Design a protein with these regions (language model features):
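Conserved small/polar residues in nucleotide/adenosyl-binding loops
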Residues: 266-268
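Conserved metal-phosphate-binding beta-hairpin within the catalytic cores
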Residues: 236-264
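Active-site flanking residues adjacent to catalytic metal/cofactor-binding acidic residues
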Residues: 29, 66, 137, 173, ...
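ATP-binding N-terminal substructure of ATP-dependent carboxylate-amine bond-forming enzymes
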Residues: 1-100, 107, 122
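Active-site nucleotide/adenylate-binding loops and adjacent lid/helix of ATP-dependent enzymes
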Residues: 94-183, 187-234
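Anionic group-transfer/hydrolysis microenvironments
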Residues: 32, 69, 140, 175, ...
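Hydrophobic/aromatic residues located in beta-strands of well-ordered beta-sheets
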Residues: 26, 85, 196, 253-254
Length: 268
């Protein structure tokens, strides 16, 4: 089997390192000339929206996946016309946009911090009046490793915050006094069979994941599996999905999902 991967970075590389011993071959589409995964398969150097090269990739492989959620959903939708793509374009559309993501959690009855859509400074002012401070403002898309977000602690932080984050669509989330952050990684096949990994406790340094410690018998494992299972079923998901939670008062509140392989699986 030959697998096409959108993105040739560290996660694509680790995906290939795991798949090669199983007899799988890989092709990576990535605009970077030094994409680190290229030593493990064919490197198609092209932008993610380059339809000619996307079609080339589709013609060469049996199926396509992606290593990170910053890939445009339109890219996945285009590829889906010619080759199976997992996870689906709809899964990516929701997971890459915090508003769609949080709205799905709410619809599925999964606890998540209070949130509001922000399209202007006036929206932000109204949301702060409703949700209160402290709160966290995040861009709806493209934020990662602490980027694309700002903590608002006092009224002076609110003025100009929308412009500070680039005057792009954002969400405002109520601040969560959490005791820890945990993540659960699940895998769901095309036949619906699902497997869950042990719940992992994550430690961050300046917004970047620095340490993940797995638990063999975490008291919140079953609850996390229930919440993740709801999302997998809703999206008819195929592939690997990571779900990050805040631990709050003996329960869990949803933070975000990642529709891909995840660094929290590299744990001790």
């Amino acid at each position: 089997m030959k697998i096409g991967v959108i993105g040739g970075g560290q996660l694509g590389r680790m995906l290939a390192l795991a798949g090669t011993p199983l007899g799988m071959n890989f092709a990576f589409l990535d605009p970077a000339p030094d994409a680190c995964a290229q030593a493990l398969g064919e490197h198609i150097r092209a932008d993610y929206g380059d339809q000619d090269h996307l079609r080339q990739l589709a013609d060469e492989v049996d199926l396509v996946t992606f290593e990170f959620e910053s890939v445009p959903a339109e890219t996945v939708a285009f590829l889906s016309q010619f080759v199976p793509v997992y996870p689906s374009a709809e899964s990516l559309r929701i997971a890459r946009d915090r508003w769609f993501e949080k709205s799905m959690f709410k619809d599925l009855g999964i606890p998540t911090p209070e949130f509001a859509d922000i399209q202007s400074q006036a929206d932000l002012d109204a949301a702060v009046a409703s949700i209160g401070l402290p709160a966290v403002m995040k861009t709806r898309t493209l934020g990662y490793d602490g980027k694309g977000q700002k903590v608002l602690r006092k009224p002076e932080d609110v003025s100009g915050a929308f412009a500070e984050l680039g005057s792009v669509p954002c969400i405002l989330e109520g601040f969560v006094p959490f005791s820890g952050e945990v993540s659960l990684v699940a895998v769901r096949g095309r036949d619906g069979e699902t497997r869950f990994y042990p719940l992992v406790h994550n430690t961050h340094d300046s917004g970047i994941l620095s340490l993940s410690i797995a638990s063999t018998a975490h008291p919140l494992q079953a609850l996390a599996e229930d919440y993740v299972g709801r999302v997998l079923k809703q999206l008819d998901y195929v592939g690997v999905l990571a779900f990050e939670f805040f631990e709050v008062d003996g329960g869990l509140k949803a933070n975000e999902i990642a529709p891909r392989v995840h660094l929290s699986l590299i744990h001790i």
